[in-house]
Amino acid sequence: MDNFKYIYGPIPSRRLGLSLGVSPIPKKFCNYSCIYCQIGVTHNLTNTRREFFPLEDIINEFKRYISSDKNFDVVSIVGEGEPTLYSKLGELIISLKKLTDKPIAVITNTGLLYDKNVQEELLNADIVLPSMDFFSQESFKSLHRPYGRLDFQKSYNGLVEFSKKFKGELWLEVMLIEDINSSKEDLLKLKELIKNINYSKIYINTAVRPPAESWVKPASKETIDFAVGLLDGISIDNLSDGNFISEIKDNYEAILSIIKRHPMNQHELKGFLLGRKLTNKEIENIFLRLKEDENIEILEYKGFYTYRLK
């Protein structure tokens, strides 16, 4: 059990607990190029839904992962791009639910929720976490830099429509960025739009890891606190506690498997390697290898050095 292409983690999540990731999308295939994206700038912009990887391969790998007793709280379909671009998303959700009694969550940027097929497929999930941090076409374009003809009203209307028929848990995610959607006026506009959505929880977040664009400013604590009060939300504007886990046996490959989907800072990396019983010398050698790897970028942000795949 030392080679996993689609399954990663589990990783500690501020919302979901210990989250086992399923990634049905290749690296940085998305219909947005969000300024705050923690895995960097989108390389492949598209609105075309495809079966990027064979559904059977993903399911077989998941079966292999759970063949021995593993500890995780939820299965999250997310990863390296926008999961609703996967044309067999509905079948993937249904297949996973047949194999585990843990909830199946889908994290989406909301862009394709106007598509009736996407809506129908997502109805099979237990938890859907859509982004809802825009309140106008201008804010939509500034935050997400959407591809093609995606627009604010279309995506918003799709989210409202989906929320009326979804029977699971809908957890809205509001990412606040200073000077773009963080003013009192912005948040009041957002509140008016959110009133039309049937949701269970609303999470208030900001850029806690290095964003795609270095000029992005995280929202202040005062802004976060105001938004939490105004929207009756839950603040998650800090890093997760807990250790990362991987079933990949090779230590370096295990790190790569995680950071191409979820960047890690130096403390998280060290904790991960200590959990795998490495000596200080072995850990030092891995950090040196990461530093010399031309496919990895090391970014200083908020007092941490964060490692992610280019």
Language-model features: where?
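Short, basic/glycine-rich phosphate-binding loops at helix/coil junctions
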Residues: 38-42, 71-75, 135-139, 170-171
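Conserved alpha-helical substructure of the radical SAM core
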Residues: 40-77, 87-91
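Auxiliary Fe-S-binding modules of radical SAM enzymes
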Residues: 1-18, 60, 67, 182-310
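Glycine-rich beta-strand-to-loop/alpha-helix junction loops that act as flexible
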Residues: 76-82, 109-110
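Conserved, mostly hydrophobic/aromatic
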Residues: 22, 34, 130, 202, ...
